[in-house]
């Protein structure tokens, strides 16, 4: 009735340890069923974009595929995955700065990388190449043609904005392809500052 067509939900991490690291205890409530919550929203003809972060201190190789699998299990219509990005003035920035983990802090030049879509720090268990590869594998997994088709057909079957779902999924897929090129350029231009 309100005209809401979609919601953006920050699930943040597929693991309880990741949620604890982020202080999202709310997501750890016993018997919380995210799939049921997503379905309840979708029953009102509202699309769900799920958001996750890659680069947490507990994240290890394989986190990208884990995020894609969990997002699929939750039944989200689209997925937005971002790098853990310490922004100046936050506790995360202060902590990572004190640990010597901020790699891009030559402002104002480096502001262009603070979009949540570029790795601007050293991650504890993932190298620069590793964290970028996790992002790529996550998006490649979630936005494969077969998975997009499955989601769009599901939305068509359930009469939930299949055209918007298709356009949204193809847009994310297209952006992902652009980011693959941007990551290659980024590593060439800035990679030495991550050593």
Residue ranges and their predicted role:
Residues 1-78, 94-99:
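Conserved non-cysteine loop/helix-boundary elements of the Radical SAM core domain that shape
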Residues 78-79, 146:
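Secondary-structure boundary/capping signal
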Residues 83-89:
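Glycine-rich beta-alpha loop elements in corrinoid/cobalamin-binding modules
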């Amino acid at each position: 009735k309100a005209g809401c067509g979609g919601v953006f939900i920050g699930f943040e991490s597929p693991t309880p340890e990741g949620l604890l690291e982020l202080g999202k205890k709310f997501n750890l409530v016993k018997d919380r069923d995210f799939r049921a919550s997503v379905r309840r929203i979708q029953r009102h003809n509202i699309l769900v974009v799920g958001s996750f972060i890659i680069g947490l201190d507990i994240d290890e190789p394989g986190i990208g595929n884990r995020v894609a699998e969990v997002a699929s299990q939750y039944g989200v219509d689209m997925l937005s995955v971002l790098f853990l990005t310490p922004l100046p003035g936050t506790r995360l920035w202060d902590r990572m700065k004190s640990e010597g983990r901020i790699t891009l802090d030559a402002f104002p030049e480096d502001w262009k990388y603070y979009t949540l879509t570029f790795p601007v720090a050293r991650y504890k268990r993932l190298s620069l190449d590793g964290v970028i590869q996790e992002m790529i594998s996550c998006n490649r997994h979630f936005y494969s043609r077969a998975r997009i088709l499955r989601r769009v057909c599901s939305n068509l079957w359930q009469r939930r904005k299949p055209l918007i779902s298709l356009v949204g999924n193809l847009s994310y897929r297209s952006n992902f392809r652009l980011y693959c090129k941007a990551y290659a350029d980024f590593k060439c231009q800035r990679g030495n500052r991550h050593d």
